[in-house]
From Swiss-Prot:
<keyword id="KW-0067">ATP-binding</keyword>
<keyword id="KW-0509">mRNA transport</keyword>
<dbReference type="GO" id="GO:0015031">
    <property type="term" value="P:protein transport"/>
</dbReference>
<keyword id="KW-0653">Protein transport</keyword>
<dbReference type="GO" id="GO:0044614">
    <property type="term" value="C:nuclear pore cytoplasmic filaments"/>
</dbReference>
<feature type="region of interest" description="Disordered">
    <location>
        <begin position="1"/>
        <end position="39"/>
    </location>
</feature>
<keyword id="KW-0963">Cytoplasm</keyword>
<dbReference type="InterPro" id="IPR014001">
    <property type="entry name" value="Helicase_ATP-bd"/>
</dbReference>
<feature type="short sequence motif" description="Q motif">
    <location>
        <begin position="64"/>
        <end position="92"/>
    </location>
</feature>
<comment type="similarity">
    <text>Belongs to the DEAD box helicase family. DDX19/DBP5 subfamily.</text>
</comment>
<protein>
    <recommendedName>
        <fullName>ATP-dependent RNA helicase DBP5</fullName>
        <ecNumber>3.6.4.13</ecNumber>
    </recommendedName>
</protein>
<dbReference type="Pfam" id="PF00271">
    <property type="entry name" value="Helicase_C"/>
</dbReference>
<dbReference type="GO" id="GO:0031965">
    <property type="term" value="C:nuclear membrane"/>
</dbReference>
<feature type="domain" description="Helicase ATP-binding">
    <location>
        <begin position="97"/>
        <end position="265"/>
    </location>
</feature>
<dbReference type="GO" id="GO:0006415">
    <property type="term" value="P:translational termination"/>
</dbReference>
<dbReference type="GO" id="GO:0006409">
    <property type="term" value="P:tRNA export from nucleus"/>
</dbReference>
<dbReference type="InterPro" id="IPR014014">
    <property type="entry name" value="RNA_helicase_DEAD_Q_motif"/>
</dbReference>
Length: 471
């Protein structure tokens, strides 16, 4: 399926802590466990400066090394400890602007898995005054899982900053009355808003507010309102930083109001998809055959780790029930689970105890598990109406694999004219090619996907990877 390919009829004719660090530290230019260097596909980050006095010719405007950023030795030690060797493209552009004094706001967009978390974490940690034992920075995320992951990265990166305190602000009935007095707080908008209103968070000294997956939070009426209320409860002169892989037009105007006079870093649509992710689709006769087709991929899914994305909680629960009943080991996570159960499931997945995770869009954004080599879109991502394609969610889903130079496979199931058209619309939006899988020989399908997964580097040319798929 290509962006220009005409619509065809398919064969025949539900809505949607620290333990994370070892997995999340691929969020920069580093080295994997085996010591071989990673590569980052070239892409262009467009920079729009709010402050016209900022000098693009200044050598610090584009930092080629972390040392150039004049970070403290404690922070540099933390960066090296996480195996970061040099800034990624987004870090190279964003960090000099984030670290300027006086601080300026930022709206930054970059591909999934390219170092956004490390960028805003370094900015947060660079501005913390350890002599003051009170909250100075808040980072918000749309899910507890992502909040815990970000907290782990910040804690690990700042491990050599003596006296640094970090805390999570996520739903927990046992800690509802706990005072949050750490230097850095990472949480979900609803919990942070409640704790601020109840004065369990002292806001006087907070100077940085970060929204990760900002477009997702600002675009949701409830969560967007919560983010706005959080900001209204903070000092007026705080630095506001918005990060995401996507900023659709409907959100960008609101983002500009939420973070006024921002430096803006953006990508074109066609630069958002990641070279190391091989995007495939499989045309299935009918919806009822999707489950049996999914089972054919179970062996491949368990060679490393895989995520199966579905549209509804009901589908997630049903897939888990059927697969477990047939002897397959899988885990399931959706918003229907209690917080502690969600923590248990994601920790099992990170540790490799569970290699296959069935989930809804609750985990489509930001979650970084290094071992994920395959993402399956059991349901094509759509808008709330279930009819219109959702390109941004597709991008975030497949971005759970192919993290920072690694290779991954994204496989989407289509089963009727509507789902085929939705996927075609997604391909057109990103101006990218999606390759069909020939299911006449399942042994050949398995061999082809194994070749892709076992590729040592995402730096293989598109031509080489396409030949693997089509040969």
């Amino acid at each position: 399926m290509s962006a220009t390919e005409p619509t065809k009829e398919p064969a025949k004719e539900e809505v949607a802590e620290q333990s994370t660090v070892a997995q999340a530290q691929v969020d920069g230019s580093g080295e994997p466990a085996n010591g071989s260097p990673l590569t980052e596909t070239e892409y262009k980050v467009e920079v729009k400066l709010a402050d016209m006095q900022a000098d693009p010719n200044n050598p610090l405007y584009s930092a080629q090394s972390f040392e150039e950023l004049q970070l403290s030795e404690e922070l540099l030690k933390g960066v090296r400890n996480m195996n970061f060797r040099k800034p990624s493209k987004i870090q190279e552009k964003a960090l000099p602007l984030l670290l300027m004094n006086p601080p300026t706001n930022m709206i930054a967009q970059s591909q999934s898995g390219t170092g956004k978390t490390a960028a805003f974490s370094l900015n947060i940690l660079s501005r913390i005054d350890l002599s003051r034992n009170e909250p100075q920075a808040i980072a918000l995320a749309p899910s507890r899982e992502l909040a815990r992951q970000i907290l782990g990265v910040i804690t690990h990166m700042g491990q050599f900053m003596e006296g640094l305190k970090t805390m999570a602000a996520i739903p927990d009935p046992t800690k509802r009355n706990q005072r949050l007095d750490a230097h850095v707080l990472v949480g979900t908008p609803g919990t942070v808003q409640e704790q601020l209103k109840r004065r369990l968070i002292k806001s006087d000294s907070i100077k940085i507010l970060v929204l990760d997956e900002a477009d997702n939070m600002l675009d949701q009426q409830g969560m967007g309102d919560q983010c706005t209320r959080v900001k209204s409860l903070l000092p007026k002169n705080i630095q506001t930083v918005l990060f995401s892989a996507t900023f659709p037009p409907a959100v960008i105007n609101y983002a500009n109001k939420f973070a006024p006079n921002s430096n803006v870093l953006t990508l074109a649509h066609e630069e958002l998809t990641i070279e190391g992710i091989k995007q495939l689709y499989i045309d299935i006769d009918k919806d009822q055959d999707k489950y049996s087709t999914l089972l054919k991929f179970y062996g491949l899914m368990t060679q490393a780790s895989s995520i199966i994305f579905v549209r509804t909680r009901r589908t997630a629960e049903e897939l888990e029930r059927r697969m477990v009943a047939e002897g397959h080991k899988v885990a399931q996570l959706s918003g229907a689970l209690e917080g502690q159960d969600r923590d248990r499931v994601i920790d099992q997945f990170r540790s490799g105890e569970a290699k296959v995770l069935i989930t809804t869009n609750v985990l489509a954004r930001g979650i970084d598990v290094e071992s994920v080599t395959m993402v399956i879109n059991y349901d094509v991502p759509t808008m709330a109406d279930g009819r219109e394609a959702d390109p941004e969610t597709y991008l975030h889903r497949i971005g759970r694999t192919g993290r920072f130079g690694r290779v991954g496979v994204a496989l989407t199931f289509v089963h009727d004219k509507a789902s085929w058209q939705q996927l075609h619309d997604i391909a057109s939006y990103f101006k990218t090619d999606l390759h069909p899988i020939d299911t006449s020989d399942w042994d050949n399908v398995e061999e082809m996907i194994q070749k892709i997964i076992k590729s040592s580097r995402a730096g293989k040319s598109t031509k080489e990877m396409t030949e693997m798929i089509t040969s």
